[in-house]
C-alpha cells in the first residue's frame, strides 16, 4: 500500500514499484535472435535424432492483398519447421507480387507433420513488419514420391485466408536413420581475437555415455564443404557466410563444433 510523505514541494506517494520499472524491454529482433539461438542449441544438444526424411520447399512467389506502407514493400519469407528456422532472400520492390524462387532443404524430425510460414516487409529504419502468415500441413502424397505444386491461402490484417496466396513446390526424400551421437565437444568460451579463432577445450561427455578414446588430430587444411556452410547458414540466417566459413575451417570442418562456437558467439554478442 502506498504511503504519503510531506516535502517542501508537496506530498509524495511512496509504494512498491513494479518489477519491470526502468527496465528496457528487448526489441522484436533481439527476441528473435534469442529464440533462433535457443532453437539451434536445442537441436545441437538433442543427442540421437532419428530423422524421417528431408523436405525440399521451393518458395516460388506470392500474391498479396495489399501493399502496406508508403513505398513498395520488400518482402521475405521465414519458415519454421520443428526447431529450425529458414529465410528466403528479400524480394526488393516486390510489393504485392514478390518472387523468390528459393529452394530450402529441411530435415523433418519425428512427430513433425507441418510447418509455419510468415512473410515480412523488410524495413530500413524500423522493425520488419509481419504482413502475412499460414500454417501448412505436409501432404502425405509426398511420401509416395510425388511433387506438390500448390497455392496456399495467407492470413493477416485483412483476416483469416484474406491476405493473399503463396506458391510452394514441395518434394520429399527418405534418408537413413542417424547413428548414435558421439560425445559433443563443448566450447565454454570463445575469444574473438580474430575471426574464427576458438580456444582448445577439453571434451565434455554427455551423462550416461561411455568414455571414448580421443579422436585423432584433424588436419587444419580440411576442405570446407559448401553444403555444410549452407546448412549452418540456414540455422543462423543473420550470420555472415564468411564468418561461418572461418569458424568451420578453424574447427577442421567439424560441423557440430562449428555450431557450438557460433552459438557462443551469438550469446556473447
UniProtKB/Swiss-Prot annotation:
Keywords for this protein: Autophagy, Cytoplasm, Immunity, Inflammatory response, Innate immunity, Repeat
Protein location: Cytoplasm
Matches recorded under CDD domains: C2_Tollip, CUE_TOLIP
This protein's record includes keyword Iron-sulfur: no
CUE domain ranges (all copies): 224-267
MF terms in GO: ubiquitin binding; ubiquitin conjugating enzyme binding
Residue window of motif AIM2: 151-154
Tree of life domain: Eukaryota
Record motif AIM1, residues: 133-136
Residue stretches making up the C2 domain: 35-152
Complexes and interactors: Interacts with ATG8 family proteins (via AIM motifs), and ubiquitin (via CUE domain). of cytotoxic polyQ proteins aggregates.
Free-text comment about domains: Both ATG8-interaction motifs (AIM1 and AIM2) are required for the association with ATG8 family proteins.
Role this protein plays: Component of the signaling pathway of IL-1 and Toll-like receptors. Inhibits cell activation by microbial products. Connects the ubiquitin pathway to autophagy by functioning as a ubiquitin-ATG8 family adapter and thus mediating autophagic clearance of ubiquitin conjugates. The TOLLIP-dependent selective autophagy pathway plays an important role in clearance.
Family from the record: Belongs to the tollip family.
Name of this protein: Toll-interacting protein B
Gene source species: Xenopus laevis (African clawed frog)
Gene designation per UniProt: tollip-b
Amino acid at each position: 500500500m502506498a504511503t504519503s510523505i510531506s516535502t517542501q514541494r508537496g506530498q509524495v506517494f511512496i509504494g512498491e514499484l513494479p518489477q519491470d520499472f526502468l527496465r528496457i524491454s528487448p526489441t522484436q529482433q533481439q527476441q528473435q535472435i534469442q529464440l533462433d539461438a535457443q532453437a539451434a542449441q536445442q537441436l545441437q544438444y538433442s543427442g540421437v535424432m532419428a530423422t524421417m526424411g528431408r523436405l525440399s520447399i521451393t518458395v516460388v512467389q506470392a500474391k498479396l492483398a495489399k501493399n502496406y506502407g508508403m513505398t513498395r514493400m520488400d518482402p521475405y519469407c521465414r519458415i519454421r519447421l520443428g526447431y529450425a528456422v529458414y529465410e528466403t532472400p528479400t524480394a526488393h520492390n516486390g510489393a504485392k507480387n514478390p518472387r523468390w524462387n528459393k529452394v530450402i532443404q529441411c530435415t523433418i524430425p519425428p512427430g513433425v507433420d507441418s510447418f509455419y510460414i510468415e512473410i515480412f516487409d523488410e524495413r530500413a529504419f524500423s522493425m520488419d513488419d509481419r504482413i502475412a502468415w499460414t500454417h501448412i500441413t505436409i501432404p502425405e502424397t509426398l511420401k509416395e514420391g510425388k511433387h506438390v505444386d500448390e497455392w496456399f491461402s495467407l492470413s493477416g490484417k485483412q483476416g483469416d485466408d484474406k491476405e493473399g496466396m503463396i506458391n510452394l513446390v514441395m518434394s520429399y526424400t527418405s534418408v537413413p536413420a542417424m547413428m548414435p551421437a558421439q560425445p559433443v565437444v563443448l566450447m565454454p568460451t570463445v575469444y574473438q581475437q580474430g575471426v574464427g579463432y576458438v580456444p582448445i577445450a577439453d571434451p565434455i561427455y554427455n551423462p550416461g555415455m561411455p568414455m571414448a578414446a580421443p579422436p585423432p588430430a584433424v588436419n587444419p587444411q580440411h576442405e570446407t564443404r559448401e553444403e555444410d556452410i549452407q546448412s549452418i547458414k540456414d540455422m543462423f540466417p543473420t550470420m555472415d557466410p564468411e564468418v561461418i566459413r572461418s569458424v568451420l575451417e578453424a574447427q577442421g570442418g567439424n560441423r557440430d563444433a562449428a555450431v557450438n562456437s557460433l552459438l557462443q558467439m551469438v550469446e556473447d554478442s
